[in-house]
Amino acid sequence: MSFPISRRSFLQTGLVAGVSIKIGFMAPRAAAALVDNGIPPSPGWIDASGHARFRLDAIAKVTGQKTFSRDFRARDIPGWPATQSHAFLIHATRADRRFAGIDLAGLQPDLQPDRLVLAADLARDGVRVPQPDFYGDVFLVPQGETPRLLGQPALLIYKDFARYDAAKRKIRLDDSVVRYGAVTGPKPPPHYGAARYVRVEGPTQDARDEFSALEDAVIFGGFAGDKVVWPAADARAGGMGKGMAMAAVIDEEIASAGDDALMLKRDYFSQSIDASAMEADNGNVWYDPAAQVLHAVLATQSPHEVATNAAALVTQSKFSLKAVDLKAGYTVGYGTKDKVIFPYFCVIAGLYGDGLPVRLANDRFEQFQMGMKRHAFWIKDTLVVDRKTHRFSVMKAELKADGGGRANLSFAVGIVGTTAAQSIYYLPKSDLSIAVLASRAVEAGSTRGFGTLQTMAATEMLVDEAAAALETDAIDLRLANVFRSGMKNTQGAVPAGALRNDEMLRKAKTHPLWAGRETRKANYDATHPGRSYGVGFAQVQKNYGSGAEAAVVTLELDRDGRLTMRHAAHEMGPGVTTSQAVIVARVLGRAPDRMSYGVVEWPEMPLTSTELPFTTSQATEDELQRNPRWTPTFVSPMATSNSAYYFGHATREAALVLLRYGIWPAARALWMRGGGKIAPNMNGPEDLRVAKGKIIAGDLEPLQLSALAAKAHELGAVTGACVHAFNRREWAEAEFDLPGAGRVGLPVDALAVKYGDGAAPALKALMRVGGFHFIERATVRYPPVQRLNAGVTRYAPMATLVELAVNIATGEVELLSHHSLLDCGPQIVPSLVSGQIQGGVAMGIGHALHEFLPLYEDGPGDGTWNWNRYQLPRASDVATWTQTAEVLQPLSDSDTPKGIAEVTMIAVVPAIANAVHHAIGKRFNEFPITPEKIRSALS
């Protein structure tokens, strides 16, 4: 298929056919839709063996055709008015006094806004924040109240760009525009939560733990001011009281540690940063009051959630709504466009646009001012090690995170960071706690790493220091304590799959950078006066998946063998559109000819959901699942490194349904033509293989997919499959009564199929739900709700060796080279894995050495921050041409891919800190490690 060069042509082919989906929990007349983002594949992108030669969208990228949400104007979108209005927000730069209103006297009359929107307007019109416990109680600060955070008191709308641009420039840094009243001190929302994971192992590895989160309880605390109040300890009780009693036992063991134990107590700090996605937050929204339709083009990682929340926002207001038409362009966010409030500001702008499309798009100053940040963490770690065996006996971590002025995912980030604090080690006793505090800072949320970078970096630095105190090799100490397959994590759960941390440690120990580090240091220091050489190592493992992952995929095979795929995933940059197509090719011998991603409309999958997968009780879920059309959640956002394993599972299962119940009957019929006999050892679809784009089995004739498709249609076999999958630390499983096949069990919770053209009328009559036969499940088994207490069960590990030099005079750090080891299971697309390693390591280098944001009044909330002040790593900072990596070979043909988008950036951070210590003998427990800090330490 050709890929036209014109941007306008791309818009027309990729972003036109918007259709509506019904949202179960909304008013009956309201609906939401998303244009399915059709992607014509670049010619020759995949070879006959199913390997991607380059990205599916590669030619679009290099010819300028890859459009982002930010590229759209009203005139680019068929059916929209040609006139484009523009809006911007005026931000409160003080959050310690009352907001007294807006003074636009500094703007001459011709620059006054066509519409000024204040909190009072929203209150009058019933425009309220969806999920106020998550996104905050107000969009705009009410007059007379103190801003909850360094935020937004007003929205200005202009009907032409020139006036908008001139006004924005004139008042950008004008402190007189926002008027303030009495000083009140900060008034942030209540703190977001406190949790504690206590584990004490049982008498043997297989025995029940004396206490763990999985088998007993996660301990939750309240707040008295900024202090956490934990439940009372009660050893005779169950649940949280018993957990607090076990925590007291751990405290006693730490306090009584004798000379035979090494005890280290250290404080660490990890700073707030901006993920600096190249596309800033933006949206373009047209509310058509005559048709009562809200049209939107928005940059988001979670289009399904945005569509449903936007519909809910409007339907509860005075504005009438029949449909939401959400068009999704490509975007990139590193987590910062997942569950963020900005799309709803865009919706508000559209509602007050007087029937014209309104574009609200942050420039880089504004993105720093209100874009999602990585959480600052304060960490107090305690580690007790047996001096004789070098085994860890106890670890205690007391963590505090600043979530800023909106709750967002802060508590979830804190919990995930807490459960990750064990890094790659087995801990017999552990007490890991987190307090997530609210403040007036810019909100923090789902930024790459999700709290684990902060906590695992601290652990890896602590372990290196312990090795030095014990006078042992740092990798040997890690090997003595490595978390192995079958062991329990700090939540009491046994991870799924084989853990290969020990294998990676052994590889790292024999790598020339590590094995020869002392000789290399002596030689380098002798030949480079004024510079000091160091090598550092760290290894981490990052969970992937949220604990409630869901995906939906449809595959259809036409009579000529052409495949069409509709997918809930959408492209965020890492290459999900390419990888999901390759998964199909690996199963069916051919990649889809036509693909639509970011699809929200699923008429063939008529499921309902309460969308409370983390909080529904077991009793309630047991009752809900009696409805064969219920699921805990319909689709996940693109986050938590979930595409390769979780979305890929749904893709693979849809392809396997086609293979087993469409391709196999067709292949068997073709191989038995003319009275011939199928090979006696060919028992079923499990014998089918893909080779050079054809379906083969044993020594039978290879078959083209086109021939198989024609026969499948003739037979009336399955030629289309839509599956919905749900995972709560394990896959939901269901049984379906599939015509012609009997009762079949699948690792999915919903199934719909389409039958071929030759199907009997009775079968065709069943295809009445979006053209498919939705087969209500006969039985279902959802993983128990208690599985959520496992915290995580799937890990992807990565290790990084760093070689650097410190300039003794200036304190500057130069990375000379780095080498990484990664276990990602089978690589779906190796070049995409390489890109994740390179990009992740570069981002980690920025966190370790360069990037920093103050939290409060002198931070990004004041509107003066841009890349002129915020230092990102450049190519010269990341050892571009001397970096190497090794990806472990998969354990078997059936090994599953792992999500790696986050783990790739973490290990390099503590590895740099450990290398700096090796270079100059000084330890740095706060990031970033700047030249100023190094000079101070050396002075």
Residue ranges and their predicted role:
Residues 2-3, 9-30:
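N-terminal export signals
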Residues 120, 316-323, 351-358, 413-448, ...:
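C-terminal catalytic domains of large/alpha subunits in multi-subunit enzymes
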Residues 203-315, 482-560, 786, 800, ...:
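Helix-loop-helix junctions that connect adjacent transmembrane helices in secondary transporters/permeases
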Residues 308, 330-361, 368-369, 378, ...:
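Thiamine diphosphate
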Residues 356-400, 649, 653-676:
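Phosphate/diphosphate-binding loops
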